[in-house]
């Protein structure tokens, strides 16, 4: 069983927006990425410059941050259990990636300002940014995306959208905690440094590459996390 995985973080300063943009475009050092494969990453949506994209959206909506620590953008990391990608062709990975941008565009419209597909780490994933402008013109992360109910609804709707790829949502109302993006990266960083063969999704290929098969350390590490996550949920819903 493979899970759809979505994490949401807060970018509450222009410095953090710039840092996220640098991470996405690999203009800053990224310890868990393979520099030899960074040219395989793809900007799926929006401009390369994340800071400019956020500023342009705020200007277009006529919104100015009211507080010094206002959340300027929500940062998404969208991925799936590592074993989901094991037998996928480059075309199938790109189809999955396109599903991420379709979901975000339908849900957040013009507030969805950037998405980047990373293929230089052990497991493909998409980083995306959404400016949290409410329908009544406020910059309000909690009302727009945050809060327990909003995040629960996001997880449910995202998993439904990913059902087409055979991905499932975890059990709702469980004791399993939502992990922040930093926690998610921290738990898998050591395993993600395991070298993996290169894959390029752009050219046509005649057969599926086995580019994740040597990343056994990564797969086993994350499978164990997913299993613990599922066990905790199942325990929580026992009568």
Where are these regions (language model features)?
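N-terminal nicking endonuclease/strand-transfer module with a His-rich metal-binding environment
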Residues: 1-239
